[in-house]
Amino acid sequence: MVPVVALVGRPNVGKSTLFNRLTRTRDALVADFPGLTRDRKYGQARLDEEHEFIVIDTGGIDGTEEGVETKMAEQSLAAIDEADVVLFLVDGRAGLTPADEAIAAHLRKIEKPAMLVVNKIDGIDADAACADFWQLGVDDMYQIAAAHGRGVTALLERALAPFFDDLLTSESEEGEIEDLTEFEDAEIAPDEYTEEEAEAEFQRLQEQPIKLAIIGRPNVGKSTLTNRILGEERVVVYDMPGTTRDSIYIPMERDGREYVIIDTAGVRRRGRINETVEKFSVVKTLKAVEDANVVLLVIDARENISDQDLSLLGFALNAGRSIVLAVNKWDGLDNEVKENVKKELDRRLGFVDFARIHFISALHGTGVGHLFESIQEAYKSATTRVGTSVLTRIMKMATDDHQPPMVRGRRIKLKYAHAGGYNPPIVVIHGNMVRELPDSYKRYLMNYFRKSLEIMGTPIRINFQNSENPFENRANKLTLSQERKRKRMMSVVKNRKK
């Protein structure tokens, strides 16, 4: 289960700053759903390569002490309900306010783990600034400087410890501010595997059912499509126990291949499909994407592609998931409208040109069966193992066709490539000065590998590693003849000085 962390507090206490730091973005627009989840932003975050979580920025809770409860009901109650843990942010420079007291009073009423976080304590006496906040009746408080990353890692370790058994919480003294700025600039280590680990991962993925997440905006036909798929296969539908925000996992089999349908809309009785109003939970959808192998994004052909569609697509890409696009409600459209829809898809979805697009009618079943051809193709592309010799040969062909650029008078040299992981496929390239490669050449290599390996339906990632020079720290050792020549030269130099 991917934990969900909600950031709650009044305006200007640093929620967006912390959100941007956790998601490693600059504009806090990681997964923004305007209109549907007003004033709440959703993003992927990682404490390290093994511990992922979803973070929600609730926006500011504004108003007086009397009005705070109303504002919270409008924009933050839903986020608090979705969250596994709440980080209640206050401003250490501004001190305690009536709005802070009202928020704290509400959090005490609900049975939800909450942590008081005093932000903006850099450059001031932190203990003195925090003194007033003990009036809120909390057992502990955590001091951070979100703008500089101080204390953020220790805070996250403490907040996420109940959800990860192997996560060691900080043993630092309460109130102590640690210099943990490595969270600010650190890059997440790429998912790298040895050859043996890559082979083991490939075998594991081939033996498991394909987990397919069906996602999309409300009322695009996700539930209709889910029931159409299940109805065609005549499987027994059951739902696994979970909370109200958990997706339903439905096992099924098609053409001898096992699948698990991750239904974010919930399973409906077949006779009541049209009576059901589709509910949309952002957290449920994002969790489904994280847990899936292949993501099936359903788009409404009768509406323009929205920012919500692009946000969901971007989230799936960032998670490295294989993608298949289903344009639903295609039946009944005249040819002119269909052509306009296709042009709009080409214009706005050019960044996922590797994904197959299907035009379907979930209600009547048109084109639904062909979806599984693309789903299997995408999964195979994401998990098929490619040997080091093949990857190195493709890399050599790419550099022969278009050499790497010169940097400070020296040409960047790529030596060899090997598989670094799957789902999504990762290619690791070793060479000299590879960190100096421009983004344009990296994109060229990515497209070259995709075309050569015929990878469809999945993103591909390339990691670059500088090859170590084995003689870098070793002093030159002269041969016997070179040593004699050196002595003669030194003797000549000394005689000239005399």
UniProtKB/Swiss-Prot annotation:
Give every EngA-type G domain span. 3-167, 210-383
Recorded GO molecular functions are:
ATP hydrolysis activity; GTP binding; ribosome binding
Is tRNA processing there in the keyword field? no
Q: Which residues bind GTP 2?
A: 216-223, 263-267, 328-331
Question: Sorted alphabetically, which Pfam families does this protein's record hold?
Answer: KH_dom-like, MMR_HSR1
Which InterPro entries did the record assign? AAA+_ATPase (IPR003593), G_ENGA (IPR031166), GTP-bd (IPR006073), GTPase_Der (IPR016484), KH_dom-like (IPR032859), KH_dom-like_a/b (IPR015946), P-loop_NTPase (IPR027417), Small_GTP-bd (IPR005225)
Which superkingdom is the protein from? Answer: Bacteria
* List of residues binding GTP 1: 9-16, 57-61, 119-122
Which controlled-vocabulary keywords does the entry list?
GTP-binding, Nucleotide-binding, Repeat, Ribosome biogenesis
Quaternary structure and partners: Associates with the 50S ribosomal subunit.
Q: Output the NCBIfam families linked to this UniProt entry.
A: GTPase_EngA, small_GTP
Q: Which HAMAP family match?
A: GTPase_Der
Recorded family membership: Belongs to the TRAFAC class TrmE-Era-EngA-EngB-Septin-like GTPase superfamily. EngA (Der) GTPase family.
Q: What does this protein do?
A: GTPase that plays an essential role in the late steps of ribosome biogenesis.
Name-wise, this protein is GTPase Der
The organism's taxonomic lineage, starting at the top: Bacteria, Pseudomonadati, Pseudomonadota, Gammaproteobacteria, Vibrionales
